[in-house]
Design a protein with these regions (language model features):
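Start-transfer (signal-anchor) and selected internal transmembrane alpha helices
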Residues: 1-8
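Membrane-interface transmembrane helices that cradle and orient dolichyl/undecaprenyl
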Residues: 129-150
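Transmembrane-helix signature of polytopic, membrane-embedded enzymes
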Residues: 82-105, 123-124, 143-148
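Membrane-interface alpha helices of multi-pass inner-membrane proteins
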Residues: 150-165, 176-177
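Perimembrane helix-loop-helix junctions
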Residues: 171-186
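Multi-pass, polyprenyl lipid-linked donor-dependent membrane glycosyltransferases
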Residues: 19-23, 66-73, 101-133, 160-171
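Transmembrane-helix motifs of polytopic, lipid-linked glycan transferases
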Residues: 69-90, 128
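Extracytoplasmic catalytic/substrate-binding loops of multi-pass membrane glycan-assembly enzymes
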Residues: 12-25, 34-50, 58-62
Length: 186
């Protein structure tokens, strides 16, 4: 549902939006500027890969749009997962509907989803991590331990958080410590 609401924004912003920081990274990827360690290497590889894909299909713009579309699909999946967690926690319908409407229509979500920026996948990776923390703490039995799905989702969130922003470790490590200490006390 959220992805459908974002389609007009994706169409208007085709192929993508970039701020000046991302533009300089893109220029580095294209060889127009010298390479810098200022930008996340993972984002550079994603941009390079999707741009090459676009060129192979006949349009570099299609490659940039492929990146933005993949980002939007990931974000919509995480938002959908957060709705599922809220439902399992018996959150009131009005709260779930309000949070879904906020994600679908608030300018910050609609605009950010069309921007190539390291903060977008980082933010949704953090939301995924928070959903897993809540699910593990409040919805799972201690005797079940960590499921394969939990490990997969936490690994994905850790990978994106640690590779997209230098401060990802300052968030990830204390939260994991709290998770493991919290499960021991249950």
């Amino acid at each position: 549902a959220v992805l459908l609401c974002w389609l007009p924004h994706l169409a208007v912003s085709y192929p993508a939006s970039m701020n000046s920081d991302t533009q300089s990274q893109f220029d580095q990827i294209l060889g127009l500027l010298p390479w810098s360690k200022h930008h996340p290497t993972l984002l550079a590889f994603f941009l390079l890969g999707t741009t090459r894909l676009g060129h192979a299909l006949g349009s570099g713009n299609a490659g940039l749009f492929a990146y933005v579309l993949a980002q939007a699909v990931f974000a919509a999946a995480v938002i959908g997962y957060s709705q599922r967690i809220m439902r399992r926690l018996c959150a009131p319908v009005w709260l779930r509907a309000l949070s879904l409407a906020l994600c679908a229509f608030a300018p910050v979500y609609c605009d950010n989803i069309t921007v190539i920026l390291k903060d977008v996948p980082y933010s949704y990776a953090m939301l995924l991590m928070l959903c897993e923390m809540v699910r593990q703490r409040f919805l799972e039995k201690e005797s079940e331990g960590f499921s394969a799905g939990f490990v997969l989702r936490m690994t994905l969130s850790a990978f994106l958080m640690l590779r997209m922003r230098p401060n990802g470790a300052m968030v990830w490590i204390p939260i994991c410590a709290a998770l493991f200490l919290g499960t021991r006390g249950r």
